[in-house]
């Protein structure tokens, strides 16, 4: 199976898992649950679930076990987008080519749906059937996702990002923002896949952390590039939004060509990290292909 087929299969699997975990929730057919479904299920690259599946499969973990962490990390991602789009944050009206949640369902339902998706993520990890995961590793997975989602990770990065609007931000500070805002959850996705494999996955965490940090920054650099050279129809969100908000970006700091070079260098670093795992007879091809996809994508 080539990478596009692999990726498409992952999208389908992640969507099925998300639907399965959302379907039994109470208050079906109410605006809040409809907002949750809209925010979590309509579109999206499913990059983070792919990282969970690819990392777990590399260690021989079954898809059945990986469905829970894949859905959990995507619930956190979906909640973060719903809240990021709110008027008090980035004030976006378009996401994945559709009206944002607060535009379609109102701000109150968007806030509640985001809150509910966040807590659903931890319910999934604590309660779901993961036959290959020990209690110790399940607790580690919950702790990992909590750390990546909170003030030490994604929320902290968003706070730094909001504070930096309209200011000149040096490269080191910009990377700090994105290691937290974007990188923390990408790192968590890789770690959840590894932790699902127990001790053999734990032993690989230092190498996988280097890989995840490199692709996390590369993902953001490419996002910044696409905000300059992309178009709204392809991106599914407003092109040029970062510039309108006065945000520092990699193209603004480095220039477009140097930003592209930085993204390529980061992906080279990621691939180099994986060589240590390939030398242990682990199949890293899916993670390598995902790294290349990150800087080849157009949305």
Task: Give, region by region, the residue ranges found by the protein language model.
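N-terminal amphipathic/basic leader segments beginning at the initiator methionine
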Residues: 1-23
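Mg2+-dependent prenyl diphosphate-binding active-site environment of isoprenoid biosynthetic enzymes
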Residues: 12, 22, 26-273, 283-295
């Amino acid at each position: 199976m080539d990478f596009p087929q692999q990726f498409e299969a992952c999208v389908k699997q992640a969507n099925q898992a998300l639907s399965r975990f959302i379907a039994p929730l109470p208050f079906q057919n109410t605006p809040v649950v409809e907002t949750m479904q809209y925010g979590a299920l309509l579109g999206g690259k499913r990059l983070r679930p792919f990282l969970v599946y690819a990392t777990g499969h590399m260690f021989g973990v079954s898809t059945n076990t990986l469905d829970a962490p894949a859905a959990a990390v995507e619930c956190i991602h979906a909640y973060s987008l719903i809240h990021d789009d709110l008027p008090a944050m980035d004030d976006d009206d378009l996401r994945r080519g559709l009206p944002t949640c607060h535009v379609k369902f109102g701000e109150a339902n968007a806030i509640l749906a985001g809150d509910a998706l966040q807590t659903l993520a931890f319910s999934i990890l604590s309660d779901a059937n993961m036959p290959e995961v020990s209690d110790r590793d399940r607790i580690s997975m919950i702790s990992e996702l909590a750390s990546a989602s909170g003030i030490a990770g994604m929320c902290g990065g968003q706070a730094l990002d909001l504070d930096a609007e309209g200011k000149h931000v040096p490269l080191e500070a910009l990377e700090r923002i994105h290691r937290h805002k974007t990188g923390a959850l990408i790192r968590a996705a890789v770690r959840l896949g590894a932790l699902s494999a127990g001790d053999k996955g734990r032993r690989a965490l230092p190498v996988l952390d280097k890989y995840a940090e490199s692709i996390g920054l590369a993902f953001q650099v490419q996002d910044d590039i696409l905000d300059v050279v992309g178009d709204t129809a392809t991106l599914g969100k407003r092109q040029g939004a970062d510039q309108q908000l006065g945000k520092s970006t990699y193209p603004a700091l480095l220039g477009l060509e140097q930003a592209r070079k930085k993204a390529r260098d980061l992906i080279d670093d990621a691939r180099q990290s994986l060589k240590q795992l390939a030398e242990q007879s682990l199949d890293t091809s899916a993670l390598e292909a995902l790294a290349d996809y990150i800087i080849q994508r157009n949305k």
